[in-house]
Amino acid sequence: MKCDKKDLLLYGVTDRSWLGERTLYSAVEQSILGGVTMVQLREKDLAQEEFQKEARQIQELCKKHQVHFLINDNVELAVEIEADGVHVGQHDMEAGQVRQKIGPDKILGVSAQTVEQALKAQAAGADYLGVGAVFPTGTKDDADAVSLDTLKTICQAVDIPVVAIGGIKESNILSLKGSGICGVAVVSAIYAKEDPQAAAAGLRKLTEEAIQ
């Protein structure tokens, strides 16, 4: 089940706070129809029971469209519902422990801001890295900035795929060209839009150009 580089091309990371009256299910489905290649459920403010219910619904949706479904941080839930994988940050469970819990066949993504963190995550069994924030972001107030030079250095230092995250939108994707990334992870540039399908389609086209 390990992810291929192409699965990371346009990585949708959910945040229901941007949705207004729309349901997360419909927004995620529209984003997949628009070209999202992988989905991460990241809902920090949901109660456990509601998060679990949402996770199962989005998991079924992703199965229907043959898109990998990952859960942010909640390793126990990811194991319980047999999600395709889990993504953890530097302040979550240590990557090596996560790998032991989820087993060798599930996808493990790890956030990194430095070469040291990136190499450590790779050694611990990460399948890909999420590196950022590469641009100012309104989604995570505490996100440390990562320069494009650092992003490039991390891509050169590791053997696993790297996804850029943080403040990515149509107007800045092409500035990531030549960095070595294999895709971008996007939150508000898809899920804050009235038409997530059109937003994803536009981002997909630009991302394909940026990683050539």
Give, region by region, the residue ranges found by the protein language model:
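Phosphate-binding beta-alpha-beta segment of Rossmann-like dinucleotide-binding domains, i.e.
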Residues: P136-D144
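Conserved N-terminal beta1-alpha1 strand-loop-helix module at the mouth
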Residues: M1-M93, Q100-D127, A143-V146, T153, ...
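Internal alpha/beta core interface subdomains
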Residues: S179-G183
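Glycine-rich beta-strand-to-loop/alpha-helix junction loops that act as flexible
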Residues: V131, V163-I168, V184-S188
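Short beta-strand and adjacent tight-turn residues that come in two discontinuous sequence segments
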Residues: L41, V88, V131, P136, ...
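A short, polar/charged loop-to-alpha-helix boundary motif
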Residues: M93-E94, T137
